Amino acid sequence: MPSRFTRRSFLTSSAVGTAGLLAPAWLGRMAAHAAEAGLLDRLGVALYTVRDQMKADTAGTLKAIADLGYRYIESGLEPSLGPAVKAAGLKQASVYAPTYLVTGNRAAWAGAGDLLPESYDWSKAVSEAKARGLEYLVVVYLQKAERGGIDVYKDLAARLAKAGEACKKAGLGLAYHAHAFEYEAIGGVRPIDVLLNETPKDLLGLELDTFWASIAGMDPVKMVETHAGRVPLVHLKDKAKGTPVQYDEGKVPHEAFTEIGHGEVDYAKFLPAAAKAGVKYYYVEQDYCTGSPLDSLRTSRQALANLTTGKRA
């Protein structure tokens, strides 16, 4: 791994020392470049990528992730992985909170895994996250029973704003993770626009997933630029070349998911744009891998290292 005195720290200190000599546009570019160069220090893995490996050997899988050079992991709020994560030398900044704590629709999640006790409410999730030193809670997915027309998303926006207010009071942030269906227009209006336009920016951020935005026909670069300052978290994964637009995640073929640098997402443009937009944490995720998920994670991290440092790291 690079030493602490990296190109990022050099550029940052240089920007301060020469602020009076450079035009503001140059300062902005240098700051973004410095942030991009530090991406590897804030790079993690979304554990859905290694879900089977985690079930078989939690400690071993987390150690393998750390050995690949990743620094963070993102997982569900419960059960807590804190001790195992710390033992592996990894960190957590964000976790997925149960969606039904916001929507109120527990029935939609029946059969999707163990549900938390009915006494466990959003305030409990916020308290747990705060106690663990986390920074963000993420609403990661809506079951089909939780979706609907635009009025449903307007109601969800109000619920998210309320949840975000509780997070803000606790010193946390709330982010919404969009898949593809949120980008499909309903009567000319996209649900993602409703969720973001009808919630205050300081109460709800976006966890942008480059794959799902791309497969929905969106440009991830334009998305992160449009919502600059509101995208603290991103999921990085690539979309196989020639994959058509698809809004239904259940109909996306497994082979559409591929390692970073092997698909259509333009990461050479996305990473600088994300840095400039203020993205704080980056999580590599690959829903399906043709081989070992750990091999896929190795390939994707190397691609990111090549893009951000221009050399192997």
Q: What are these model-derived regions, one by one?
A:
Residues A35-L40, K63-D67, P79-V95, S123-L134, ...:
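Acidic (Asp/Glu)-rich catalytic clusters
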Residues V45, I65, I73, V85, ...:
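Conserved, mostly hydrophobic/aromatic
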Residues Q53-A64, L115-E128, A216-M223, Y267:
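Short, acidic/polar
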Residues R42-G44, Y72, K91-S94, Y136, ...:
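Structural preference for beta-strand elements that scaffold enzyme active sites
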Residues K168-E264:
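Acidic/histidine-rich catalytic cores of soluble enzymes
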Residues A15-V16, A23, V102, R106-G205, ...:
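Active-site acidic/histidine proton-transfer and metal-coordination neighborhood
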Residues W26-D57, K63-D67:
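C-terminal segment of N-terminal export signals and the immediately downstream linker at the start
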